UniProtKB/Swiss-Prot annotation:
Entry text on domains: The presence of a 'disulfide through disulfide knot' structurally defines this protein as a knottin.
Keywords assigned by UniProt, alphabetized: Disulfide bond, Ion channel impairing toxin, Knottin, Secreted, Signal, Toxin
Protein's recorded name: U6-theraphotoxin-Hhn1a 3
Source species taxonomy: Eukaryota, Metazoa, Ecdysozoa, Arthropoda, Chelicerata
Organism per entry: Cyriopagopus hainanus
Superkingdom per UniProt: Eukaryota
Chain ranges passing through the membrane: none
Entry comment describing in which tissues the protein is expressed: Expressed by the venom gland.
Cystine crosslinks: C63-C77, C70-C82, C76-C89
Alphabetized GO MF terms: ion channel inhibitor activity; toxin activity
Localisation: Secreted
Propeptide stretch(es), residue numbers: 34-61
Signal peptide: 1-33
Its job: Ion channel inhibitor.
Length: 97
């Protein structure tokens, strides 16, 4: 009698543990998807914030300044490079005169 009760409890515990792992898996997947959407939205907002080039026309100055919109690095001023993802001129980590 005691062994049957222990066996039932053991099966019940196994089911509870399995359900707990399944719930944790669902929460982890949901959290990852939510974080991915937040990152995409944050990148889109950040890109839109700096995409407008409020400075002078690039033809007038010959190059685009820091955070100016660009398509290739040659459009940016010295010590700036066109950022691959956001398409603006960012510092290329060089220092010089």
């Amino acid at each position: 009698m005691l062994i049957k009760q222990f066996s039932r409890r053991s099966k019940n515990t196994k089911v509870q543990i399995l359900l707990a792992f399944a719930a944790l898996f669902v929460l982890a997947v949901g959290s990852y998807a939510s974080e991915s959407k937040k990152l995409d939205l944050r990148d889109a907002l950040f890109s839109a914030m700096f995409s407008a080039d409020y400075q002078l026309n690039p033809q007038e100055r010959g190059c685009r300044y820091f955070l100016g919109e660009c398509k290739k690095t040659s459009e940016c001023c010295e010590h700036l490079a066109c950022h691959d993802k956001h398409k603006w001129c960012a510092w290329d980590w060089t220092i010089g005169k």
